[in-house]
């Protein structure tokens, strides 16, 4: 019995360590909201590509479940990357993109810039901890679908989403003021399967996070 206890403790410690290891530009990664199936994040140093695996019921209502590769960031920034699901088949509501959130609490204040499995492009947010995300007043849809490049920019309390195709100009999806988002927050890449029984995969590359020089 004691042997089994130490084996389980060893497995738990290894999993916890894996969840906090740096991945490329990001200091941490892990599952938010305790999804049924564990996700992962890896970085290929040769191709500068991130590989994300994630499950989770959704990023919606008053709590979230997803895999998150993230770092702490303070002040203004511009984050840009190219996103692609691995595998053509999957839930039309599976999600990848950029996210900024107050904390790793599953009910945290957050804003995400999303590309869905069916190509739907949207900016959505939770303004207060534990608040239900609202449709349609808590999101901005773009009329066109299927873009690869997603950009999230913060200027003061304003967050701006832009999208585009590789090599093309960026188009603005919308902007939203987040007065309750702290100056120091968590920024990163995410994936959610929109199905607790499934683990989805995505690759992300050409990842850049730029911040203005300190005055």
Each model region followed by its residue ranges:
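Extracellular glycan-recognition regions
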Residues: 19-215
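Bacterial Sec-dependent N-terminal signal peptides
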Residues: 1-20
């Amino acid at each position: 019995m004691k042997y089994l206890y130490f084996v389980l403790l060893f497995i738990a410690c290894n999993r916890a360590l894996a969840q906090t290891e740096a991945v490329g530009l990001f200091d941490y990664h892990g599952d938010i909201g305790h999804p049924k199936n564990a996700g992962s994040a890896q970085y290929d140093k040769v191709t500068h590509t991130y590989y994300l695996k994630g499950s989770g019921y959704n990023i919606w209502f008053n709590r979230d479940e997803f895999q998150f590769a993230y770092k702490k960031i303070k002040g203004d920034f511009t984050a840009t990357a190219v996103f692609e699901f691995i595998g053509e088949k999957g839930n039309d509501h599976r999600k990848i993109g950029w996210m900024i959130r107050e904390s790793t609490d599953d009910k945290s204040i957050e804003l995400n810039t999303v590309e869905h499995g069916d190509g739907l492009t949207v900016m959505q947010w939770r303004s207060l901890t534990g608040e239900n995300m609202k449709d349609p007043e808590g999101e901005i849809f773009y009329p066109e679908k299927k873009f690869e490049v997603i950009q999230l920019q913060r200027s003061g309390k304003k967050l701006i989403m832009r999208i585009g195709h590789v090599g093309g100009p960026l188009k603005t999806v919308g902007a939203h003021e987040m007065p309750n988002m702290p100056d120091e927050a968590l920024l990163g890449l995410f994936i959610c399967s929109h199905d607790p029984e499934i683990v989805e995969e995505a690759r992300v590359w050409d990842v850049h996070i730029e911040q203005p020089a300190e005055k």
